[in-house]
Design a protein with these regions (language model features):
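Substrate-binding rim/cap in mid-to-C-terminal beta-strand-loop elements of soluble/periplasmic
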Residues: 180-211
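His/Asp/Glu-rich, glycine-adjacent segments
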Residues: 3-6, 10-135, 223
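Intrinsic disorder/low-complexity segments enriched in small, polar and charged residues
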Residues: 214, 222-223
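Short, hydrophobic alpha-helical segments
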Residues: 158, 208-216
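Short amphipathic alpha-helical segments and helix-helix/interface helices
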Residues: 41-49, 151-155, 205
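Short glycine/threonine-rich loop-to-helix capping motif typified by GTGT followed
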Residues: 140-141, 175-180
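A long, amphipathic alpha-helix that forms part
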Residues: 111-121, 125, 133-164
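Active-site metal-binding loops of divalent metal-dependent hydrolases
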Residues: 168-173
C-alpha cells in the first residue's frame, strides 16, 4: 500500500495478521476506525485469552482520559487498548498495582524491573510504549532523553530475567530531522527461542502464536 504507515492500520495488522491498510484502501491513524473493530475482536489478546493464557495489558491510563476517549462511537484508543477491551481485559488506572505508565518514567530501570516481575505472574504482558513516537512528532530535539529512558527500561527488564519481544508498527524516531513516519523496516527483537522471524507486520501474530503455543501447551497447563 502506497503512503506512509499509520498506527491505526499498522497496529491492527500487527495484532491481527490482516493487512488493514489494504482492507481500507489507505493507511489510517492514529486510532483504528470502526471498520477495523471486527478485526480487533480476533486479535492477539482474544487468541491468548481463548488459549487460557494469563494475560495482562499493562498500560496505565488516567480515568479522565478514558472517559473522553470512550464517549462516542469513534474510540480514541489505540489498537492495543481496543483489542484489550474487546477481549474483556480492563484498562488499568495509574494507581493500579499491576499498571505501568507508558513512558516518561522517573525510574525507567525500576519500571523495567517491575515489568519483568509481572512476566512471572502472567504468561503474556503487553506494554505499548509511545513516548518515542510522541517526541518524534512534537519535540524531536528531546528524543535522546527517550532513547536513554527506553535503554534503561530494557536493562532493568532483562537484568531482572524478563523475556523480551520488542517491535513497532512504524518508524519515525530514527529520522529526527522531520516529524513524519518513515518507510524504514521496524525492529523485531526476541530474547527467547523462536522460529524464523516474519517478514512484515502481518506475520507477527502467527509467529507469536507459534512461540506461545510452544511455551504454554494446554496439556502442560492442565497438569
Amino acid at each position: 500500500m502506497e503512503g506512509l504507515p499509520q498506527s491505526g492500520t499498522g497496529q491492527t495488522a500487527l495484532l491481527t495478521g490482516v493487512n488493514a491498510a489494504r482492507l481500507l484502501g489507505h493507511h489510517q491513524g492514529p486510532f483504528p476506525s470502526p471498520r477495523l473493530r471486527p478485526l480487533l475482536k480476533a486479535s492477539l489478546y482474544a487468541w491468548a485469552k481463548e488459549e487460557g493464557l494469563a494475560l495482562l495489558h499493562a498500560n496505565a491510563y488516567r480515568p479522565e482520559y478514558l472517559e473522553k476517549a470512550t464517549r462516542g462511537r469513534r474510540l480514541f484508543l489505540s489498537a492495543f487498548a481496543q483489542s484489550a477491551r474487546l477481549a474483556g481485559l480492563p484498562l488499568l488506572p495509574l494507581d493500579h498495582p499491576l499498571a505501568l505508565p507508558p513512558g516518561f518514567w522517573e525510574d525507567p530501570y525500576g519500571v523495567g524491573a517491575k515489568a519483568a516481575a509481572l512476566t512471572r505472574r502472567f504468561d503474556l504482558v503487553v506494554l505499548e510504549y509511545w513516548a518515542l513516537d510522541l517526541l518524534a512528532h512534537r519535540d524531536p530535539e528531546r528524543l535522546p532523553e527517550r532513547f536513554r529512558e527506553l535503554t534503561l527500561f530494557l536493562r532493568g527488564f532483562l537484568e531482572e530475567g524478563g523475556e523480551l519481544l520488542l517491535t513497532s508498527d512504524h518508524g519515525n524516531a530514527e529520522e529526527p530531522w522531520h516529524p513524519r513516519h518513515t518507510l524504514n523496516p521496524v525492529p523485531l527483537v526476541y530474547t527467547g527461542e523462536a522460529p524464523p522471524p516474519p517478514l512484515d507486520l502481518t506475520g507477527v501474530l502467527p509467529w507469536m502464536q507459534r512461540i506461545l503455543t510452544s511455551k504454554y501447551k494446554k496439556s502442560d497447563r492442565n497438569t
